Amino acid sequence: MAKGEVLIIDDDPDLCAAMQAALQSEGFTVRCANQGSLGLKMMRERRPDVVFLDIIMRMPTEGVWVSEEIANDPELRSVPVVMLTSIVGSEFAGHFPTDRPLHAHKFLDKPVPLNQIIEIASHFACQPASSYN
């Protein structure tokens, strides 16, 4: 029996593969999407227990858009979102929109140790979804 279901939305294939391998070795079912629209489609097909979401993908604020879509969807808004980014110190740092709220339950700077990813996934997978609203 799987510990829970994790969706990773990130355009970095190496990061996705590393996170997927680490989480699967701990008993999680893991799906990956390399762009926001695909991640939303996958969420609507089968709701995950937690989403790890990159902020900067094809567009500098694609992850912000995805988090807004999740927050505005009654079927998805209870899914915990963990935002991942390497924006600190990047060329995008000065262009990031600070006037829009980030709809995230946790915010992590890359690189994130894989053991921390596992701990976070374990925490959210064993909590009732209603406790995140």
PLM regions and their residue ranges:
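Non-catalytic signal-transmission and effector/linker regions of two-component phosphorelay proteins
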Residues: 1-7, 113-133
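Conserved sequence signature across two-component system core domains
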Residues: 9-10, 33, 51
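Two-component/phosphorelay signaling modules centered on CheY-like receiver
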Residues: 13-31
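Helix N-cap/capping motif at the beta->alpha junctions
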Residues: 32-41, 62-63
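Short amphipathic alpha-helix used as the core "switch/output" element in two-component signaling
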Residues: 41, 64-77
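Active-site beta3 strand of CheY-like receiver
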Residues: 46-53, 57
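His-Asp phosphorelay/catalytic-motif detector in bacterial-type signaling
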Residues: 47-49, 75-80
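Alpha4 helix (beta4-alpha4-beta5 surface) of REC/receiver domains from two-component response regulators
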Residues: 61-65, 86-109, 115, 119, ...
